[in-house]
């Protein structure tokens, strides 16, 4: 069933319902009619597509010729062979292109000034782009796709800047970051090595409490020091106690100057002279324990005073120049302790 509803622009706003078989007699040239097509029509075994069904606006003319043209257009859309497929691409098309919702407008070049054709269609979907015919962006106020909208220079909120980076640029950026990290790591390693080297060269920069005395080896060559020396020295008798033994032990400490260098040490009791001579003849160790408890002796420096003669008062006299040193400078071994009133100096470490 096809019905016409008058949408004329006359002052009386007449409403007419005319059957499709009756003649169409408009009152004015500016009248518009709403045509409703509810049936399927076939032409050459072809069915009217769903996009061509719905409401159609028709504008009438003043002469029967216009009526005949409208009747021909009505028959054309009753039995179409997809006539609107290329409507938006023709030079006479005035519409927004094919879309599932919206409206299309087309007018003939011979009557573009007086009559036109408007077709309204219903359905779901979005708006087509006015330039390329693709689906336009939903929120675009220019009714265009993003590419066409940006190419025309329109300021639209749908122009979102893409955060995608090509794979080649990503690899280049990763290589640059890796090279920068390696360079920073190498710079840090060089700084650490330089700092460690400075600490080794400058022992005073160490945070240890005990400082190492610099060792001067100048003049310690064998040619500058004689194998035997006769000199006079003062031997001071001291009483020492061992940590492992409660019994006290007597020892002598002395210091001599040989070749401009000071040699100092403590002489421990090695037992009776006959026993010591037997041990030396037998090849025994002169630093073994004595008769006072078998205490192990350290810093046995008898070479410098091997030729000295010990008296009962603790004084040793020998031929040679008189060179006496303060006995309080003589250190004691770490494994022993001296009686009260005796100063203790730890021995210096040799390199």
UniProtKB/Swiss-Prot annotation:
The keyword DNA-binding applies. One of its GO terms (cellular component) is nucleus. Residues 129-156 bind DNA. It is found in: Nucleus. Zn(2+) 2 binds at residues 129, 145, 149, 156. One of its GO terms (biological process) is positive regulation of DNA-templated transcription. The keyword Isomerase does not apply. Its main location: nucleus. A motif (Required for homo- and heterodimerization) lies at residues 258-261. It holds the Pfam family DUF702. Keywords: Activator, DNA-binding, Metal-binding, Nucleus, Transcription, Transcription regulation, Zinc. Residues 11-22, 175-193, 303-320 have a biased composition (Low complexity). Zn(2+) 1 binds at residues 129, 132, 140, 145. Residues 1-23, 170-219, 286-320 are annotated as: Disordered. GO terms for molecular function: DNA binding; DNA-binding transcription factor activity; metal ion binding. It comes from the Eukaryota. Residues 204-219 have a biased composition (Polar residues). Belongs to the SHI protein family. Transcription activator involved in the transcriptional regulation of terpene biosynthesis in glandular trichomes. Binds to the promoter of the linalool synthase TPS5 and promotes TPS5 gene transactivation. Acts synergistically with MYC1 in the transactivation of TPS5. PANTHER family: PROTEIN EXPRESSION OF TERPENOIDS 1 (PTHR31604:SF18), PROTEIN LATERAL ROOT PRIMORDIUM 1 (PTHR31604). Forms homodimers and heterodimers with LRP1. This is Protein EXPRESSION OF TERPENOIDS 1. It comes from Solanum lycopersicum.
